[in-house]
């Protein structure tokens, strides 16, 4: 059966993360049968990492705050998590299903495909987002 996405529900969750006034900084999009629907959401990145278990595949939209003391800004990441115990067929299907998620999640600084929990570390993601942002204007120390 072809995968579908609940666009309205997923768009509402996506917009919640994009809203700077919202405490929600991440949302997952998971499979409910053959439909992609919003999953968990939260205000703590560590709670997101707990969703990424070896037997699950999911997509996540995450807001990170970057910059220095003078200039804070939000950067967004689209993360595809594929656990180690996910079957080969499901792994392959995740890649094509991501196009459905991208119909909703359109604005992000960098995309990640991760199956190793070490790559989910917040510092690693932030450093990759910083590289993707181009020039580094952090306050210089002399």
From Swiss-Prot:
One of its GO terms (molecular function) is actin filament binding. Residues 66-75 are annotated as: Flexible and important for F-actin binding. The modification N6-acetyllysine is found at residues 102, 126. GO terms for biological process: defense response to fungus; regulation of actin filament polymerization. It is found in: Cytoplasm; Cytoplasm, Cytoskeleton; Nucleus. SMART domains: ADF. SUPFAM superfamilies: Actin depolymerizing proteins. Keywords: Acetylation, Actin-binding, Chaperone, Cytoplasm, Cytoskeleton, Nucleus. Changing residue 131 to A: Abolishes 5LO-binding activity. Residues 2-130 form the ADF-H domain. InterPro entries: ADF-H, ADF-H/Gelsolin-like_dom_sf. GO terms for cellular component: cortical actin cytoskeleton; cytosol; extracellular exosome; extracellular region; ficolin-1-rich granule lumen; nucleus; secretory granule lumen; site of polarized growth. It comes from the Eukaryota. Widely expressed with highest levels in placenta, lung, kidney and peripheral blood leukocytes and lower levels in brain, liver and pancreas. The modification N-acetylalanine is found at residue 2. Binds to F-actin in a calcium-independent manner. Has no direct effect on actin depolymerization. Acts as a chaperone for ALOX5 (5LO), influencing both its stability and activity in leukotrienes synthesis. Belongs to the actin-binding proteins ADF family. Coactosin subfamily. Interacts with 5-lipoxygenase (ALOX5/5LO) in a calcium-independent manner. Binds to F-actin with a stoichiometry of 1:2. This is Coactosin-like protein.
């Amino acid at each position: 059966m072809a995968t579908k996405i609940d666009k309205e529900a997923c768009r509402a969750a996506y917009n919640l993360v994009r809203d700077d006034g919202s405490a929600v900084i991440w949302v997952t999009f998971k499979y409910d049968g053959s439909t992609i629907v919003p999953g968990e959401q939260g205000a703590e990145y560590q709670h997101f990492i707990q969703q990424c278990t070896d037997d699950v595949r999911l997509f996540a939209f995450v807001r990170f705050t970057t910059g220095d003391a003078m200039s804070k800004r939000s950067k967004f990441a689209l993360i595809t998590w594929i656990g180690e115990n996910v079957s080969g067929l499901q792994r392959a299907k995740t890649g094509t299903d991501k196009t459905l998620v991208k119909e909703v999640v359109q604005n992000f600084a960098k995309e990640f495909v991760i199956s190793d929990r070490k790559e989910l570390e917040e510092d690693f993601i932030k450093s990759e987002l910083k590289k993707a942002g181009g020039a580094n204007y952090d306050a210089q120390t002399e």
